[in-house]
Amino acid sequence: MSDDMSMGLPSSAGEHGVLRSMQEVAMSSQEASKMLRTYNIAWWGNNYYDVNELGHISVCPDPDVPEARVDLAQLVKTREAQGQRLPALFCFPQILQHRLRSINAAFKRARESYGYNGDYFLVYPIKVNQHRRVIESLIHSGEPLGLEAGSKAELMAVLAHAGMTRSVIVCNGYKDREYIRLALIGEKMGHKVYLVIEKMSEIAIVLDEAERLNVVPRLGVRARLASQGSGKWQSSGGEKSKFGLAATQVLQLVETLREAGRLDSLQLLHFHLGSQMANIRDIATGVRESARFYVELHKLGVNIQCFDVGGGLGVDYEGTRSQSDCSVNYGLNEYANNIIWAIGDACEENGLPHPTVITESGRAVTAHHTVLVSNIIGVERNEYTVPTAPAEDAPRALQSMWETWQEMHEPGTRRSLREWLHDSQMDLHDIHIGYSSGIFSLQERAWAEQLYLSMCHEVQKQLDPQNRAHRPIIDELQERMADKMYVNFSLFQSMPDAWGIDQLFPVLPLEGLDQVPERRAVLLDITCDSDGAIDHYIDGDGIATTMPMPEYDPENPPMLGFFMVGAYQEILGNMHNLFGDTEAVDVFVFPDGSVEVELSDEGDTVADMLQYVQLDPKTLLTQFRDQVKKTDLDAELQQQFLEEFEAGLYGYTYLEDE
């Protein structure tokens, strides 16, 4: 399904007619700069995402073609008018292809800069995102590309697509005989298939099946390094890693192959420090250690031809350019320079040939290309009213709160903001306890809570974010007073890493970014689980527990974009509350301002999700029909209820507008 949306959809660059005619609502460059800093778009957006003159998010899938832009807010509204359901993934295959070109270009520059004679090859590990649209977009990019598999199912997908590229295939993960035989079949078909030995028991099966198929195996070895990265994924590297061979086992593998007359089959050295490496120093240390394995294996007579440094190339989810778990303190060029220099230096020092360098950079290729867009279905916000004095005979705790409120408005008072806040908190605590004991009425409790909110609001206005001593109080008050936004999505399905490992993703409204973010909000999903909430948000150069929000109409809140969800999230998403896959569209943007949208995934229906848990929709419909027939409802109402039930079975799992 393809829709040409070039008619009626303005692009956000080259908007010579539509946007230029709306200068009365266009924001100043100063306002734009402030919004970019608030959400750090300039850093995590990586030139793919920006704020246009209308205060809308714009997307430039290929920064080398800056005139090819689309207003994302306008695109979503146009799609909604055409029947697009939310939540939905908006995928930009051109970003995938630009990421691939950028990584290849960085390594080309590094090789030229350091006089490195070996080749470079990017291998895409499909575990990061196995969707056909992703794999085929990368394969059809025109760039050299290999594929990596970590299971039998992935290897079958890779082999089927390999005919389009005739390229390198790397086989990682634990392997049984069927997996190994599939890989050897690929080698026999003419592909370069590297079977990476992860444990010693695999080598006997490899040699046995290679003989059966009369094929020379192409082998790799994964060395377990002492070096280890830091962060959420550090356990995938280091001496305690689940994968790889220790130094003793590497020697044992070499001798086993020598005795079998297959030492020439060992052609690839592989290591992996961990995913999303935040610190370039950790990467440099790991590459230097692995380079020693390359040198020592050559001394043992092993002609290693490929040096696979694995994954680890991170992306800056926060936009803080730091060593935090969800950021990186380096760019593509520095990453490539460190790898090429370390390997080349070891080769020059020992008079060895420069091997082909392979990286398995999945996250860095796919993260940016997908945005989850959803609608806010409800807002709960604190409204501040002018407080009235309590009755003269009101209990002491109420009188105390009122006295604090009056003192806050007296000129020249010497008490601190913190002291006012603490006094009001203690009074409110006493009132809550007294309410449970029957001392205070419901009306008195409500009055105290409303007055406390007004006091918090008053204190907040007088705090200075630049004053370090004020920051803890500001954070506390922002959490207490933030708007609660109920968003039509499942955190567990669409952003499982935000729940499982507390990963941060950029989240912000798609419009209204021409206004100062005066409000704060927390985002809650529609699952029946208190964990279904986003706990951390980008806020300038730091991370906050509430999200900056421009002023908005609570009856018509803006759509929200959840950015950089292209790596792992679609694959790891689970079925909590039986919320399924969202709809997905591929968006192509062209220099003339035209946009082409293709529906790539219709999303799961309720029936789809029920079948996952062995609940047959037809059986459920029959059971429901039997119940309805036994009621004393009239025939017309019975038929109406049956039709509604059946329509619901084959409808979207998310909330839909009537």
Swiss-Prot record:
Cofactor: pyridoxal 5'-phosphate; Mg(2+)
Class of enzymatic activity (EC top level): lyase
Activity's thermal dependence: Optimum temperature is 50 degrees Celsius. Thermostable. Active from 20 to 80 degrees Celsius.
Record note on pH: Optimum pH is 8.4.
Protein modification: Processed post-translationally to a 70 kDa mature form. The N-terminus is blocked.
Gene Ontology CC terms, in alphabetical order: periplasmic space
Annotated positions binding substrate: 307-317
Residues the record lists as N6-(pyridoxal phosphate)lysine modifications: 127
Organism domain of life: Bacteria
Catalytic function, reaction form: L-arginine + H(+) = agmatine + CO2
Pathway field: Amine and polyamine biosynthesis; agmatine biosynthesis; agmatine from L-arginine: step 1/1
Inducers of expression: By growth in an acidic enriched medium containing arginine (biodegradative form), by growth in minimal media at neutral pH (biosynthetic). Putrescine and spermidine repress the speA gene and feedback inhibit ADC.
PANTHER family, per database record: ARGININE DECARBOXYLASE, BIOSYNTHETIC ARGININE DECARBOXYLASE
Function: Catalyzes the biosynthesis of agmatine from arginine.
Protein's name according to its UniProt entry: Biosynthetic arginine decarboxylase
Protein's organism: Escherichia coli (strain K12)
Gene transcribed to yield this protein: speA
